[in-house]
């Protein structure tokens, strides 16, 4: 049965027509919001987090029908299959067991293997942190460069930045991902080769960007006086292909394993997170895993009606497939979560930006929305104008951390006030009549410019304090949200074939840039002209 033919889908279409013009400010009016209030009915907790869904354009009936949709789409069955280690990535014939990386149950899939690798990580991380592991001249490691791209970069960078307040001050963490040499050159200007450790992270250890940067970094070490037989003191590798790591020149003892049953964008819990563990220490890394495991248990055990990942995913479907929203915004009111929107861009769009269903037929409904965002309050002074007064409705996830992780506590009430006020303003709006009063006598022409449509939907996620545990829960919340949506849309969130074609053609273009003569028949006229211009520039 296709999605459009599910009874709940049909019922949701009728329900949408009934409430599409209803206004949130009316629903929140005191006479329409008796106890239990909307805030009480639509605020739920799990995994140490709280989520206020009340400012969404939903009613009790909306949630009832959305949960019915989840059941008809067999969300619970696919969830259970994923946790059990069944093949839930059929195009690659793989399980998706990122949850096993943080499981405490000794009967969980691959528990012994995961525990052994984490113990190896912890031993190494402690040695780097306490100075037992040194560079080839005996100096302590003061700089760690993580070389990876996509899931091998975004997750570790996001978490390391978010948890700087619990990280060691003795080691600086650097992240290099782009094949643009400026990325690596910028970092090399800041580090001493005698005090630098490189972590090269690639599932296959053949990724173009990562291996280009790794080779350049290896050459830099040698040029700076590191003997080739001493490079083992400065390089470790993380990969599912240990043989390729050794072929690159990294000592076998310096190889940390990841597995093909963990997707890159779900892998920060594995040895891919070695840079995180060095930064915050093994004990705090365990807390990160524990927080994710808290959310895993909530996802598995909470009824769908009160299940945070399920509700977050279903409400996203409500806006994407019924309201027709093209994008959604993530606005963490926390500078520590600066890189969370970038991380979620990959998690959501690489996972669910698909058009082929599991049975190979193409969807006839929208899937992943464009994910974007910026920390508050910066975003207010950049794009919130469009959110408030533009014609496009963009659903928003606000994320508020209730207690600061820094000593400037007097700033925090201002930060929280802005977060909560934005959600209220987006919901309420300002009518033309109200705008005329604001404009004042004789300025009626200004009133239209002072109106706000309102009725803009938002969810507010509350985190008591930004700790490794709460961050782990927050990340896992979005991981499971992705699975919920993928299940309803009947797509595979664990592959990423969309990145392949460009990589294949990229190798052809790279060869053409270096060829003695350009074959003008090989490409379309636009690409040929671009290559010709680049060839001329590269020869200058």
UniProtKB/Swiss-Prot annotation:
User: Which gene produces this protein?
Assistant: pgi
Protein family (similarity comment)? Belongs to the GPI family.
State the PROSITE patterns in the record: P_GLUCOSE_ISOMERASE_1, P_GLUCOSE_ISOMERASE_2, P_GLUCOSE_ISOMERASE_3
* Compartment(s): Cytoplasm
Q: In which pathway does it act?
A: Carbohydrate biosynthesis; gluconeogenesis; Carbohydrate degradation; glycolysis; D-glyceraldehyde 3-phosphate and glycerone phosphate from D-glucose: step 2/4
What's its catalytic activity? alpha-D-glucose 6-phosphate = beta-D-fructose 6-phosphate
**What keywords appear on the UniProt entry?**
Cytoplasm, Gluconeogenesis, Glycolysis, Isomerase
List the GO terms this entry assigns under cellular component, sorted alphabetically. cytosol
Q: What is the purpose of this protein?
A: Catalyzes the reversible isomerization of glucose-6-phosphate to fructose-6-phosphate.
Q: What is its main location?
A: cytoplasm
Q: Which organism is it from?
A: Burkholderia multivorans (strain ATCC 17616 / 249)
UniProt xrefs under Pfam families:
PGI
What InterPro entries is this protein classified in?
G6P_Isomerase, G6P_Isomerase_C, Phosphoglucose_isomerase_CS, SIS_dom_sf, SIS_PGI_1, SIS_PGI_2
Name of the protein in question: Glucose-6-phosphate isomerase
**MF terms (GO), sorted A to Z:** carbohydrate derivative binding; glucose-6-phosphate isomerase activity; monosaccharide binding
Q: Which residues form the active site?
A: 350, 381, 503
> A biological process (GO) annotation for this entry?
glycolytic process
């Amino acid at each position: 049965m296709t999605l459009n033919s599910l009874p709940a889908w049909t019922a949701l279409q009728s329900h949408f027509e009934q409430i599409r013009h209803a206004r949130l400010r009316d629903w929140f009016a005191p006479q329409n919001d008796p106890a239990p209030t909307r805030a009480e009915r639509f605020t739920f907790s799990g995994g140490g987090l709280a989520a206020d869904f009340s400012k969404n354009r939903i009613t009790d009936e909306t949630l009832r029908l959305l949960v019915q949709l989840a059941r008809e789409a067999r969300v619970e069955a696919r969830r259970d299959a994923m946790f059990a280690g069944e093949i839930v990535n059929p195009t690659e014939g793989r399980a998706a067991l990122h949850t096993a990386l943080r499981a405490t149950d000794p009967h969980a899939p691959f528990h012994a293997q995961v525990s052994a690798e984490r113990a190896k990580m912890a031993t190494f991380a402690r040695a780097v942190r306490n100075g037992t592991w040194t560079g080839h001249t005996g100096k302590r490691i003061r700089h760690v460069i993580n070389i990876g791209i996509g899931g091998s970069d975004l997750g570790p960078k996001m978490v390391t930045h978010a948890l700087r307040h619990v990280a060691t001050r003795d080691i600086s963490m650097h992240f290099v991902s782009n094949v643009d040499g400026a990325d690596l050159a910028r970092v090399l200007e800041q580090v001493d080769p005698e005090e630098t450790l490189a972590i090269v992270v690639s599932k296959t250890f053949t990724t173009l960007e990562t291996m280009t940067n790794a080779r350049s970094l290896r050459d830099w070490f040698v040029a700076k006086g590191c003997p080739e037989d001493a490079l083992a003191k400065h390089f470790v590798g993380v990969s599912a292909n240990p043989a390729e790591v050794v072929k690159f020149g990294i000592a076998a003892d310096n190889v940390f394993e990841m597995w093909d049953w963990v997707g890159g964008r779900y892998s920060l819990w594995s040895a891919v997170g070695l840079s995180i563990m060095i930064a915050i220490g093994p004990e705090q890394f365990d807390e990160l895993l524990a927080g994710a495991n808290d959310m895993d248990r909530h996802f598995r055990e909470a009824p769908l009606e009160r299940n945070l990942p399920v509700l977050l995913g279903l409400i996203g479907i409500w806006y994407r497939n019924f309201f027709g929203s093209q994008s959604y915004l993530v606005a963490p009111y926390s500078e520590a979560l600066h890189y969370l929107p970038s991380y979620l861009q990959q998690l959501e769009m690489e996972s669910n930006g698909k058009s082929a269903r599991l049975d190979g037929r193409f969807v006839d409904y929208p899937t992943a929305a464009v994910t974007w965002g910026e920390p508050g309050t910066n975003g207010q002074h950049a794009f919130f104008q469009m959110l408030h007064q533009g014609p496009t409705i963009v659903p928003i996830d606000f994320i508020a951390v209730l207690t600061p992780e820094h000593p400037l506590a007097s700033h925090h009430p201002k930060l929280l006030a802005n977060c909560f006020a934005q959600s209220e303003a987006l919901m309420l709006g300002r009518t033309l009549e109200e705008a005329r009063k604001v404009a004042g006598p004789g300025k009626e022409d200004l009133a239209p410019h002072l109106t706000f449509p309102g009725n803009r939907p938002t969810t507010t996620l509350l985190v008591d304090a930004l700790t490794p545990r709460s961050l782990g829960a927050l990340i896992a919340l979005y991981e499971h949200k992705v699975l919920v949506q993928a299940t309803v849309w009947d797509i595979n969130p664990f592959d990423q074939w969309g990145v392949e074609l460009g990589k294949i053609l990229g190798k052809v273009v790279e060869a053409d840039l270096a060829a003695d003569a350009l074959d003008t028949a090989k490409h379309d006229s636009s690409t040929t002209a671009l290559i010709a211009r680049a060839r001329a520039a590269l020869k200058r």
